[in-house]
A protein has these predicted regions:
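Polar/acidic, low-complexity leader/linker segments enriched in S/T/G and N/D
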Residues: 1-92, 219-222
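Residue microenvironments linked to proteolytic maturation
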Residues: 4-19, 120-222
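A generic structural signal for short beta-strands and their flanking turns/coil linkers
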Residues: 57, 95-98, 115, 127-129, ...
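A structural detector for beta-sheet-dominated domains
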Residues: 62-64, 102-103, 125, 134-136
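Short, flexible beta-strand-to-coil junctions
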Residues: 63-69, 103-107, 169-177
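Short, surface-exposed beta-strand/loop "edge" segments at domain boundaries and coil↔beta transitions
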Residues: 65-75, 106-111, 138-146
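A glycine-rich, hydrophobic loop/mini-helix early in the fold
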Residues: 88-123
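Charge-rich (especially acidic), low-complexity segments
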Residues: 224-238
Length: 238
């Protein structure tokens, strides 16, 4: 089922360190270009060969984490985020329409010009949601390096070694519980977009799954005061 999010234009964004109900935007990752692919393209260009991009430009990513306080001061409980991710996988990823834009478009729905990538798969590793996305490239960019789509721009920035992020868009409520901002169970994922910033600690897009390992949060984590408070809350929330 594809949802209608036309009502989003009427919602206010719940900003950093705020409570309330509305649009929740989390900048959750960085894109780092696939080294072998980028090196080969640059080598071909330097050698005077024809500019050719691979047919499938795919990168791995950390998309989001549960139980970890992000830069917006919010924590997504395990049951809330896992439930919504599973729904997103069934409704979007499995049907080949898990598309995202470059930057968050002002409109509530994507046009063809907005599409920058399509998420191919998502899976959990501990507290961390990882997966792969395929950049949406035009024939003109693949053959001649001419940018005409958002996906072309993303690929071109990766060629220039620019760090790019991934950001989730969703709708839901944030409540203050014991001094910690918790995303409530009315949360609903809309999509992930490609952006220029990130808010989830250590969430990055990498060459492959092995490169993601240093940024993946396991079920057990350091017993700092904030983590101890979070753990106590999780026993109530999960």
């Amino acid at each position: 089922m594809i949802r209608n999010y036309s009502f989003l234009s009427q919602l206010n964004e719940v900003k950093k360190d705020q409570t309330g109900t509305g649009l929740l935007i989390e900048n959750d990752g960085h894109i780092i270009p696939p080294k072998d692919t980028i090196s080969q393209i640059k080598e071909d260009i330097d050698s005077g060969h024809k500019f050719v991009m691979p047919d499938d430009f795919i990168v791995s990513a950390v998309f989001q984490k549960y139980g970890i306080k992000n830069a917006n001061g919010r924590i997504y409980p395990e049951n809330v985020l896992k439930t919504q991710v599973e729904k997103y996988i069934q409704e979007r990823v499995a049907t080949g329409c898990a598309i995202g834009a470059l930057d968050h478009p002002q409109a509530s729905s994507l046009s063809g010009h907005d599409v920058a990538m399509n998420i191919l798969n998502l899976e959990w590793q501990g507290r961390t949601l990882v997966g792969e996305m395929k950049l949406h490239l035009s024939p003109g960019y693949k053959r001649y390096g001419i940018c005409s789509t958002s996906g072309d721009l993303v690929a071109n920035m990766l060629l220039d070694n620019i760090l790019i992020g991934v950001s989730s868009r969703g709708v839901g409520s944030v409540k203050n519980q014991g001094g910690v901002l918790i995303v409530d169970d009315d949360y609903d994922i809309i999509c992930w977009d490609v952006v220029m910033e990130a808010s989830t600690p250590g969430a990055m897009i990498k060459l492959n799954r092995a490169d993601l390992q240093p940024f993946i949060e396991s079920k057990t984590h350091e017993n700092t005061p904030i983590n101890e408070k979070i753990s106590r809350l999780e026993k109530i929330l999960l």
